[in-house]
Amino acid sequence: KPDFTKERKKTEREKEWLSRKEYNPFLWKAWLLMGRSQFYKGSFDEAASTFSYMIRLYKTQPSIAQRAKAWLAKCYIEQGWLYDAEEIISEMKRDSVHWRAQKEWNYTLTDYYIRAKNYDLAAVYLRKVIKTEMRRLQKAREWYLLGQLYESLNQKENAFNAYKQVVKLNPPYHVEFNARIAMSEV
């Protein structure tokens, strides 16, 4: 813990900084990377414990803690524990989401509502995900998924427009081919 020997009264920002348990400004990225690697490896219990530890460790820094909460909810969703994921999501909705954690939450909410078969809300959050996505191939995949969601909701025109967006993004051949086939089926 760093020394703080100023004689004056501490500001709120200084109090928050001194109440932290971790002072390395880049270590949270290592924790997040470790949890994500465990998640993608399929070790959801290990990933959930890593993200739970991150939430406790960085509780004074909302942007980091909320990212970890989003990934913890993803772990629960992948394990089929929708009730636990819903508990985290309702807690998140009660509090305001930090703008730096918004993208992770949109991904998580999209995944949750797809698993819960609430396709209307999934489409709303998937639209938000598409707005923030920078990678062209990933954006094409998300538009394709949005087209599939609209198809399952019997919104044929919206599905057609979503598949048309996939073709506009000039994705790899197999993605474009599947989008054109889906356009002809709608």
Language-model features, listed with the residues they occupy:
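Acidic, polar-rich low-complexity tracts and alpha-helical solenoid repeat scaffolds
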Residues: 1-186
